[in-house]
Amino acid sequence: AYYSPSQDKIHLPSPGSFTSEYAFNATALHELSHATGHPSRLDRDMGGFFGSSQYAYEELVAEMCSCFMGVNLDQTASPDHINNHKAYVQSWIKAIRDKPETLIRAIKDAQSAAAFMDWKAGLITDKEYSQTMNSTMEIATRSRDRDAR
């Protein structure tokens, strides 16, 4: 499964290709998270190549967003799936150790992506979406201000 920014298209195998419905949904949410970064949506920097720090950052955002959104699914993640999420996020831990503020920024971007998907799905109102986006922007600003000191 992958998201193509140039085509603005998600390529997702059929549900039968996955080990479970949860695995399919988690993967779909991960790829949808990437799609929120498109310039016509939240406009995240998605220009990184595989192995670059920008690529790692975007993967961290998408995986965290997938986990945030997965809470809303009426499904229980198996221990294997939880370990898969954990391993995926741990694979990007070096970037976080090198620049701890990266984690704060990634959480903010993951929350923004989750709010965007909730808003587009009609799960939250325009007002709730605006409030969420404003609060995540305030957190990002405070984090940047602290880092500048």
Regions flagged by a language model, labelled:
Residues 22, 36-63, 79-89:
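Post-HEXXH active-site segment of zinc metalloproteases
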Residues 137-149:
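Non-Sec secretion/translocation targeting segments of pathogen effectors
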Residues 1-23, 27, 38-42:
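Active-site scaffold of zinc-dependent metalloenzymes
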Residues 13-16, 45-51, 92-96:
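Glycine- and acidic
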Residues 27, 60-67:
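Residues on a specific face of well-ordered alpha-helices
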Residues 67-140:
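Long, well-structured alpha-helical subdomains associated
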